Design a protein with these regions (language model features):
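Solvent-exposed strand-loop boundary residues in beta-sheet-rich modules
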Residues: 105-107, 123
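Short, small/polar residue-rich loop motifs at catalytic or cofactor-binding pockets
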Residues: 15, 94-96, 114
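A structural microfeature
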Residues: 111-113, 129
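Hot-dog-fold acyl-thioester-processing enzymes
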Residues: 1-64, 118-163
Length: 163
């Protein structure tokens, strides 16, 4: 586990835009943004002890309930990515967070991914409270992020505004 700065969004995930991720428009295809964000979710889950080992050891797993992606600016093959994560809320079974994808060297915001993740009991495959070993670090992280400004992309809905 990386020791994060708890008073700021987690800055613990890096990636590079792979050639296979490029579409006919010459930029990263929309689906691969979600792939990159999913890898960042894996990194996040390890921060509160519910990574791959959690499922491998048949304790539990996490399921994504809902996602919302915004595309701010394109990235291209070979571009380095920096993905930060901010916890927006959590309860006994869920965590609500947002990933922010930046071009790692130019610094611009490329995309965001807001997610609701739920803890699942391995045996029953039903929702279950976070185990203590996950809830303690998750609560600490959420508390540290509570005072952070809410990103403007968080909580958005999709629709065409009527004039």
């Amino acid at each position: 586990m990386i020791e994060p700065n708890l008073g700021a969004p987690l800055d613990i995930h890096r990636a590079t835009v792979l050639p296979a991720w490029i579409d006919w428009n010459g930029h990263m295809n929309v689906g691969y943004y979600v792939v990159a964000f999913d890898k960042a979710t894996d990194t996040l889950c390890r921060q509160f002890n519910v990574g791959w080992e959690y499922t491998r050891d048949k304790i539990g797993m996490t399921f994504v309930l809902e996602v919302h992606v915004t595309y701010e600016r394109e990235v291209k093959e070979g571009d380095p990515l920096r993905i930060t994560t901010q916890i927006l809320d959590h309860d006994a079974k869920r965590v609500h967070y947002i990933h922010m994808m930046y071009h790692a060297t130019e610094g611009y915001l490329a995309a965001t991914n807001e997610i609701m993740l739920m803890n699942i009991d391995f045996a029953s495959r039903r929702s279950a409270p976070w185990p203590e070993f996950a809830l303690v670090p998750l609560t600490k992280l959420a508390g540290a992020h509570k005072g952070l400004p809410l990103p403007k992309q968080a909580g958005r809905i999709i629709g065409i505004k009527k004039k």
